[in-house]
Swiss-Prot record:
GO terms for cellular component: peroxisome. Its main location: other. It comes from Saccharomyces cerevisiae (strain ATCC 204508 / S288c) (Baker's yeast). The keyword Lipoprotein does not apply. Keywords: Meiosis, Peroxisome, Sporulation. Required for sporulation. Required for meiotic nuclear division. GO terms for biological process: meiotic cell cycle; sporulation resulting in formation of a cellular spore. It comes from the Eukaryota. It is found in: Peroxisome. This is Sporulation protein RMD6.
């Protein structure tokens, strides 16, 4: 079967932390652009996902364990997404299963990046930060088009299972953003808890950053066991 036309860049946060302002700013704006879609559509959350370039890593929760956190990007054409791409990134050998070929994975072959990622060629983003033993939490999950988020989630999870021995992933979602069905039916998560956040709790620390919001909303905690993960 023909190879999957997917290109996934794996960015260890330890390398990203040392990278240039241009590199970090491009990811900061891309992630905020993805979160702006539900933020503006539903009008509940006022503050951007990442408040500033200086709070990029703390707002996404990477600062708690930078060494074991990663950010994945789904790119349509790596050579258009990052200048002189192959001088800065090298390919990981893809593994093929019976159903389809896996995408091409790339990792940095340098200790810091200097250029900006072109947001027009970045189709989705997802970050993973340690939650507890053999468990990681999703952060910075965006999709710039139909199906891109699902594709990146599935392929990034495969890499997390094989390279980080990840056995489960957890996620906190906002119920009023109509994400429950997406996480349950498309990604295979199950709900384990939900709680209400009251408007009177101004700037409550809901996720990893302080959130400004216009009315009460619910946070749903979800989990996915990866033992039976299938594409």
């Amino acid at each position: 079967m023909s190879a999957c036309p997917c290109n996934i860049v794996i960015l260890p946060v330890e390398i990203l932390k040392n990278s240039s302002k241009d590199t970090k700013y491009s990811l900061y704006t891309t992630i905020n652009r993805g979160y702006d879609v539900p933020r503006l559509k539903y009008g509940i959350i006022v503050s951007p996902r990442v408040h500033s370039l200086e709070t990029l890593f703390s707002d996404l929760g990477f600062d708690k364990n930078i060494e074991k956190s990663s950010l994945y990007l789904l790119l349509n054409d790596p050579t258009l997404a990052y200048p002189n791409f192959h001088e800065h990134f090298e390919q990981l050998k893809g593994e093929t299963n019976k159903d389809l070929s896996l995408p091409t994975y790339y990792i940095p072959k340098v200790q810091f990046l200097t250029e900006a990622f072109d947001s027009e060629h970045t189709l989705a983003t997802i970050g993973y930060k340690p939650n507890n033993k053999e468990s990681y939490e999703i952060t910075g999950f965006t999709s710039m088009g139909n199906g891109y988020g699902i594709k990146l989630f599935n392929y990034s999870v495969i890499h997390m299972m094989r390279s980080h021995k990840c056995k489960r992933v957890v996620a906190d979602i906002i119920m009023e953003h109509d994400l429950l069905g997406y996480y349950e039916k498309k990604l295979g998560f199950v709900e384990v808890q939900r709680f209400k956040v009251l408007k009177e709790q101004h700037q409550v620390k809901v996720f990893d950053d302080k959130v400004d919001f216009t009315k009460d909303f619910h946070v749903i905690k979800m989990i996915k066991e990866l033992g039976n993960h299938r594409l």
